[in-house]
Design a protein with these regions (language model features):
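Short amphipathic alpha-helical heptad-repeat segments
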Residues: 1-15
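Amphipathic alpha-helix face/heptad-repeat signature
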Residues: 3, 31-34
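Hydrophobic packing residues in well-ordered alpha-helices of helical domains and bundles
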Residues: 7, 28-31
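Positively charged, low-complexity intrinsically disordered regions
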Residues: 12, 23, 44-45
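Charged, low-complexity interaction regions
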Residues: 18-28
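Amphipathic alpha-helical coiled-coil segments
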Residues: 37-46
């Protein structure tokens, strides 16, 4: 999967998690880190 594909997937998961009545803060934090990593990789390797 491309870095853009990963970024899109993590963004989609984050939106789903935030839409829940009681979002899991740990999962949100992990997804934000993954999104940031994918953005960095896109800037430097694609």
């Amino acid at each position: 999967m491309s870095y853009y594909g990963e970024w899109k997937m993590f963004r989609w998961e984050l939106e789903e998690e935030l839409a829940k009545p009681k979002p899991d803060e740990k999962k949100i934090e992990e997804l934000l880190i993954e999104i940031k990593n994918a953005e960095w990789m896109m800037q430097h390797y694609e």
